[in-house]
């Protein structure tokens, strides 16, 4: 990904490498769009994952390795600009494929636009811009912003209890207020007609207290602001047997969704 901002050892832009990055990105998405063009609305394309960030201009031109000894040197502002250009190119590639045989569905397909690092605060930064749908009649209705939510870090990511930032429980008024204040920032997208997909959220590990309350609040408050949250499975669901591993979690799902007889281990 850092090929988009490649520079030589003296800080001069390596335009040959940068052009190659665009060429590769366009080739990848052209193939994907045409290969799956006849699939229906259950298939959503996403422009990237967490890589649209400082990765597009940092020292690592892949994820962890340099590209032929070259390193990137984009500023943070420039990384935002490149991210916005990549997302716009993504929309154009998919929409332009709709005139190919069996690809008509790509004209109206829902597209997921990767936020900056898929980080909530960085995506709500004014430098991040949603792309323009090149099918004018779609307006904003076929574009959704993609973010991941693991905040606060001590709760969402950390598993080591010896870490000073580890948060082993969730449910205080402060916890609720923080989640609400964060999610309220996302309304800038839903208020302007865009969808919001919280493509990942989680809680470190299942030893923590208050997990059902946390997941419930993400789901219910997320719905209020027009977001669809997708839980990262931190061992609450047994994929082999298709059952929920914790009774209180299953009860919470029944309460929130109205489902009955949620399969329990």
Predicted regions and their residues:
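Active-site region of glycoside hydrolase catalytic domains
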Residues: 19-161, 167, 184-203, 224-225
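Substrate-binding cleft of secreted/luminal carbohydrate-active enzymes
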Residues: 173-264
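Generic structural signal for helix capping and beta-alpha/helix-loop junctions
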Residues: 5, 120-121, 206, 239
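Short secondary-structure transition/capping segments
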Residues: 46-52, 156-171, 229, 234-248
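Generic hydrophobic, helix-prone segments enriched in Leu/Val/Ile
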Residues: 14, 18-25, 117, 128, ...
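Flexible, glycine- and charge-enriched loops at secondary-structure boundaries
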Residues: 15-22, 76, 80, 169-179, ...
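Aromatic-lined carbohydrate-binding surfaces of glycoside hydrolases
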Residues: 1-11
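Mature, structured extracellular domains of secreted fungal proteins
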Residues: 9-14, 18, 28, 38, ...
């Amino acid at each position: 990904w850092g090929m988009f901002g490649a520079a030589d050892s003296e800080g001069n832009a390596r335009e040959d490498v940068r052009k190659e990055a665009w060429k590769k990105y366009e080739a990848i998405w052209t193939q994907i769009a045409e290969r799956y063009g006849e699939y229906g609305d259950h298939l959503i394309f996403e422009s990237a994952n967490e890589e649209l960030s400082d990765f597009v201009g940092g020292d690592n031109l892949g994820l962890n390795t340099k590209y032929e000894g070259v390193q990137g040197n984009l500023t943070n502002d420039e990384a935002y600009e490149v991210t916005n250009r990549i997302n716009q190119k993504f929309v154009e590639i998919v929409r332009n494929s709709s005139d190919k045989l069996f690809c008509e569905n790509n004209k109206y397909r829902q597209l997921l636009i990767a936020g900056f690092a898929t980080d909530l605060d960085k995506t709500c930064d004014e430098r991040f811009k949603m792309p323009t749908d090149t099918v004018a009649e779609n307006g904003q209705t076929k574009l959704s912003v993609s973010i991941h939510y693991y905040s606060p870090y001590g709760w969402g990511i950390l598993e080591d209890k010896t870490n000073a930032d580890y948060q082993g429980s969730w449910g205080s008024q402060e916890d609720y207020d923080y989640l609400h204040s964060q999610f309220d920032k996302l309304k800038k997208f839903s208020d302007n007609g865009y969808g919001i997909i919280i493509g990942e959220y989680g809680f470190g590990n299942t030893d923590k207290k208050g997990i059902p309350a946390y997941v419930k609040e993400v789901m219910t408050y997320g719905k209020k602001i027009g977001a669809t949250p997708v839980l990262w499975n931190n061992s609450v669901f047994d994929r082999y047997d298709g059952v929920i591993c914790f009774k209180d979690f299953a009860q919470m799902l029944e309460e929130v969704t109205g489902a009955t007889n949620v399969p329990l281990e």
